[in-house]
C-alpha cells in the first residue's frame, strides 16, 4: 500500500557509534577521507540513486565500521601526536589548521612511518570520480512517474470559434 511506511527494526539500526568531537574529526579528516574513500562514495551513491536512506543501511554500516577501524589504528599507532594535533585545533579559536602546522607535521610523519599513509594533496579528495559498485541499479533511478495516457482523438469536425479568438487584444 502506498500509505504504509515500513521502518527498519531497531536491530537493523544498531551500530557502534563513532564517539569523537568535531576537533578530532577535523584533525583526522584528510587521512580518513583517503582511507575510507570507497565506502563513503558507495554510501553517497546509494543515497543519491535510491532517494531513500532505509535502502542504504548496509552501506552506512560499512562507513561506520571503516571509521571505527580508522580511529582504532590511529589510537594504536599514533595516539600521542594525534592528541597533540587535535588538542591544538580544539584550542585555536576557530579550529584553524594554520595555527597547528607543527603538530600536523608530527602527526603526518607518524602516520607515514607507522601506517604508510600519505596525506592527500589539497583537492585530491574533492575530485569527481566514478564509483565501481556491485549494487544493482535501482528499478527507477530517476524516480520518474509513469507517463500519462495520450489525449484521445477528437471525433467530428471542429468549427472555428463563433466570435473569433479568445485573446481579445489580437482581435482589435
Curated annotation (Swiss-Prot):
- Can you name this protein? NADH dehydrogenase [ubiquinone] 1 alpha subcomplex subunit 8
Q: Which domain of life is it from?
A: Eukaryota
Reproduce the free-text note on domains from the UniProt record. Contains four C-X9-C motifs that are predicted to form a helix-coil-helix structure, permitting the formation of intramolecular disulfide bonds.
Q: Which GO terms describe its biological process?
A: mitochondrial electron transport, NADH to ubiquinone
> From which source organism is this entry?
Bos taurus (Bovine)
- PANTHER family from the UniProt entry: NADH DEHYDROGENASE [UBIQUINONE] 1 ALPHA SUBCOMPLEX SUBUNIT 8, NADH-UBIQUINONE OXIDOREDUCTASE
Q: Compositional bias of type Basic and acidic residues: which residue ranges?
A: 146-159
Give GO cellular component annotations, separated by semicolons: mitochondrial inner membrane; mitochondrial intermembrane space; mitochondrion; respiratory chain complex I
Purpose = Accessory subunit of the mitochondrial membrane respiratory chain NADH dehydrogenase (Complex I), that is believed not to be involved in catalysis. Complex I functions in the transfer of electrons from NADH to the respiratory chain. The immediate electron acceptor for the enzyme is believed to be ubiquinone.
Annotated PROSITE patterns: CHCH
Amino acid at each position: 500500500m502506498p500509505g504504509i511506511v515500513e521502518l527498519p527494526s531497531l536491530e537493523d539500526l544498531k551500530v557502534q557509534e563513532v564517539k569523537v568531537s568535531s576537533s578530532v574529526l577535523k584533525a583526522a579528516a584528510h587521512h580518513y577521507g583517503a582511507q575510507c574513500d570507497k565506502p563513503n562514495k558507495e554510501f553517497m551513491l546509494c543515497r543519491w540513486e535510491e532517494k531513500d536512506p532505509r535502502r542504504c543501511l548496509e552501506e552506512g554500516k560499512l562507513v561506520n565500521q571503516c571509521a571505527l577501524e580508522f580511529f582504532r589504528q590511529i589510537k594504536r599507532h599514533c595516539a600521542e601526536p594525534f592528541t597533540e594535533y587535535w588538542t591544538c585545533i580544539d584550542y585555536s579559536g576557530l579550529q584553524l589548521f594554520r595555527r597547528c602546522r607543527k603538530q600536523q607535521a608530527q602527526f603526518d610523519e607518524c602516520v607515514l612511518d607507522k601506517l604508510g599513509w600519505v596525506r592527500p594533496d589539497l583537492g585530491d579528495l574533492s575530485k569527481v570520480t566514478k564509483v565501481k559498485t556491485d549494487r544493482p541499479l535501482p528499478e527507477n533511478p530517476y524516480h520518474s512517474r509513469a507517463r500519462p495516457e495520450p489525449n484521445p482523438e477528437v471525433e467530428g469536425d471542429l468549427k472555428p470559434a463563433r466570435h473569433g479568438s479568445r485573446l481579445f487584444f489580437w482581435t482589435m
